[in-house]
Structure formats: structure tokens, C-alpha cells
Amino acid sequence: MQLLTNGSRWHIHHGDCIPHMAEMPEASIDFSVFSPPFPSLYAYTSEACDIGNSEDVRTEAKLHLSFFYRQLARVVKPGRAIVVHVAQIPRMKRSGEVGLHDFRGLNIRIGERAGLVFEYDWCVSKNPQSQAIRTKSRELQFAGLERDRVRSRGSLPDYLVKFRVPGDNAVVVDSDCQVSRNDWIDWAEACWTWREIRETDTLNVRAGRGEEDT
């Protein structure tokens, strides 16, 4: 664990989240928002303990995530919220499987087993044309549509899954300068549309963009 910088009310650390959270005081976090590595889809490191290197979503990745959620439920304060960004994961041909892994459902089930309360999830729609070009998914491409429509499917959305830690929230979050009523009308929509979200406006977008990325 490495402390990168800090202020009077915050600290920024760099380290492996699972062993690092084990060192953190209980009930020391006010809010957690994160996106877990998607198993077998993106490789971030060569480490065996990296969730992204898990080949089997239903066993290996499930075990990794269970350690994570148990520590997360311990360090977040009672009554506070946790928001997780996830998506469903296509099964790879190399595994001999077809269809989708229910990664959204897996995170919900593991979170509940760790003691968290599953409260809600927002759906974030995706541009099907952009996703077809980026992923080269035959289920989305026009070629697949014109070859055999039985195999066609829609674009895969993202999800924002909201958990809450059991207990009473000691400090009420009610500042009127953070979220206006008009903002809340938009944010409370069950599905956020891709036309209103700038998907490429992310951290390190220039450094992380490939030559064929749109």
C-alpha cells in the first residue's frame, strides 16, 4: 500500500484493494463507487490474483469477488451506499460456451452474501452500432442479421448496482447544492440513454485509446 497524497479529510492510496482493505479500519469509508475487473475479458496485469485473469466466472472469479465484498462490507460505514458499475460478459468461443455470463447477478448475489442490501440498479444503454464496430460481435453486426437472425441480440448495456450497508446513517446527506430537483428527475430515470452520455470522456482517454477506437 502506498499513500500518494492526502488532505485534511481525504487520502489517496495506491495498492491491491483486497489486502489493502484488510488493513483499513472498520466503518471508515463514507461512499464506495467502483467497477470490478471483468473476468476473462480484460487483462490488466499478469498476476494470478488479478480478477481480470480469471478464466471461469462461476468459480474462480466468484471466489476473488467474495473476498472483495466481505472487506468492502466491513470498511464502509453503516447506512452508507455502494455503487458498482458492471455489465454482462459474453461467453468466449475458446471456452466452448455460448451466450452470456450473468456478471451483474453474480455481483448482486455475492454482495448480499457479504451482508449488503441490494437496493436498486440503473441500466445504461449502449449505441448498438458503436458496440458492433468495437467488439465485432456477430450477434450485433449486419452480417449476422442477414445470415441467421436466430443468433441476433441487442447491445449489452452497463448497469449501476446500488447496495447499502445495514444500519443507520449517522450523517444525513441532504445538501441542496449537490443535486437539484431537475437533476434528480433525470438521474432517477430507470434507464440512462447512450445519447446523453459521453462514453469517451474518461480518465486517460487519450493514452488508452486504440487506433481503431471510435
Where are these regions (language model features)?
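Core catalytic lobe of class I
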Residues: M1-T214
